[in-house]
Amino acid sequence: MEIKVRSLTNCEVAPDGGTISLGFEDVAGNAAAVSVSLNQVGALIMTLPGLLEAALKARYGDQSLRYAYPLSSWALEQSTDTTQRIITLETEDGFKVRFSIPKAEQSLLGEALTQPMPEVMVRPN
């Protein structure tokens, strides 16, 4: 069954942490919700950015487009695995994403960030 969503209304975590509920209003004005198990939430989160970028490219017919969030802050912390660190990237409105980074990649990332940016063509919106 396909449901066309007008707006997202609320998002909640079950008291036991086992599911996440996404509440919405459909185009007819009816309230509804989708409950996703904790096991499937990770798969959903990993899928959405790729779908968003594919939709953006399809809508505007431009394969160079990227959906990017403005970075407001970042933090590094040690993982329980001593060969890894965790980097948290955060936007001003509180969206966060975390990545674990092996030691070798940490150095490569640091070096890459210190290099001058290559010249690229900037196109106005």
Language-model-detected regions and their locations in the chain:
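Positively charged, low-complexity terminal tracts
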Residues: M1-N125
